[in-house]
Amino acid sequence: GPSIFTLKHLEKLAASDYNGAIFTSDGILIDALKHGVTPEKFSNYYCLSVDGNSEKIWKWYDDRLVDQYANKIKFILNSTVAHNVYQRIKEVGGEAYWFNAMMDYWPGQESITRVMSASLRGPRRPNGLVRIATAGNCGASLWIQACSIFRRFTICLIGLDMGYPDGMPLEQTYYYDKLFKAVQGNMEFVKA
């Protein structure tokens, strides 16, 4: 979120003597690298992607710094991530690790998560992918995965604003255009 810039968290992290793991969301990856939060300084470096929108997410990977550092970053990818992003990560030497975001109560017979998990089984993964509650955004998903998968319990969260800044017009939010189209311009329905 915006606090990562207003509070200069990236600059502080880059200048620190912190020697633990870095878990970054895809949306902040390029900025983190530009500010010196790189896998050269922090050797356990992870980047998570959950978004399946191939147009919006691409810009977070289309940079020379991603080219330079991808082979030192472990990319944690949701099974629904945009295919062009996965191709890009492979192209620049990044290592991909997969998970399946839980969409609903997965043991239920009509569960979307259950169907997705079944479709992801194969000879290499007879049980499918690990299922993880993601809380609907990269930051919260990273927090959950840092604890539950990577067993990191001392965590400093930066830039996890859990929403948009106060006063931000709805029209400037990230998926406004898609929402506007989905409700056929009837934004009163959304504001209610």
Where are these regions (language model features)?
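Metal-ion/cofactor- or nucleotide/acyl-coenzyme-handling active-site neighborhoods
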Residues: 1-192
